[in-house]
Amino acid sequence: MKIRANLKKLMCAAVVALPLLSTVTQAAEPIYPNLPAEIQNRLKSSGMSTWGMSAYVQAIGSPRPLISHNAQVARNPASVMKLLTSYVALGTLGPNYRWPIEITTNGSLQGGVLSGNVYIKGYGAPDFDTKALREMLNQLRRKGIHTIQGRLIFDDTFFNGPKIDPGAFDGKPYSSYNAQPDALMFNERRSQFTAARKGNRISVTTSTPAHNLRIVNKIKRAKRSCRVSTSVKRGRGDAVTITFSGYLARRCRNRGFTMAVTDPANTMYSAIKKIWTKELNGRFNAQFMVGATPANVRMIHTHYSKSLAELLPTVVKDSNNVMARQLMRSIGAKRFGAPGTPKKGAEAIDDYLRKQGLNFPELRIENGSGLSRYARISTENISHLLSKAYYGPHRDVWLRSMAVAGVDGTMKGRLRTSAVRGRGFFKTGTLRDVRGIAGYVNAADGRT
């Protein structure tokens, strides 16, 4: 969808949260000094004061906002923060950037037998999954390789940083949205399990096995109950045991679980072994290891991810937290060199914004996804970012990444019957006690 440059746009940003900081810069007086009556009435009916809301609405190119309410108060933007991460990624990495995954060796490759130390090094590809892995392994088979033996060493050193408790945000460490970044990310760390009953037999299976993962099935037969719960126990090293408990009656449908319980390297190793032997009829006798790739290796194959432009709608439109975290560390590595860390990522984002004339003194960014209680930015500065991006060189990619009102992404079920349907391009944000939305709306006479 190409957005024509000559159409008048309205830009809006609104974030609801408890304030923490406020800026003191002088702002232009809004054309409408008060919030519209409809908004005030809605706030009143919800039991919320106008003090708890910030709003900023401005016509693109206009020196004055239409509405400015608590616009300089620093709020928690929730997932609206992904706009900053995406904007800086476009400016630093570029829309055509693709993340490599390298297969190298300092062993031998003779007669189709790849032996010795074989290294798989990741550079933070957000989208590397089973489908991409299968494609990569197919390329090896096409090169005549039929046997992998020795040691398969997984290199995730391109990212680093302090160990983060994935449950620190909300006490749910195994929820897929809390999955932490990894330079060798695989399937967004997601492991999928299915509990099913056929007759008197109850089974628990996984489509994403890992050689360090053990499944314990304690589900019992029942006449009515369909309740199944899980518990996770970590053992020595990287061993993980998941216990499924509860009851399944004959009438129960299959119960599906998606969890972030294993690290990408272990899951990838098991997937490689399965695909190589079961699907590609190859031979596999390689031990699992994790380590850094040495200098004296030769390239066997390089796989490339989809481009940033292709991935950005998943980050923004669908509000993918894992990919946003990957982007932030990639930005940090690009600006300050490897390894990519949260600190480098946050500093790189702030540095790039300043170079674009976007000085946000209240900005606090933790992980690039907005899944944070620490993050802060004002609605006025979100609007300044939107204006800058609209006039920037990547406007079409930027706008295509946003959720269209009433049509797709996080806006698919919102504003479906309003005049804004199909004409609004938004990024939404939701946390406990936080609701936010920012983006663009075509004027009544606008066309797309």
What are the residue ranges of the model-derived segments?
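Bacterial N-terminal signal peptides
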Residues: 12-22
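Sec/Tat signal peptide C-region and signal peptidase I cleavage site
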Residues: 23-27
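Residue-level preference for non-acidic, small/hydrophobic
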Residues: 63, 82-89, 152, 184, ...
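Short active-site loop at a secondary-structure junction
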Residues: 68-88, 92
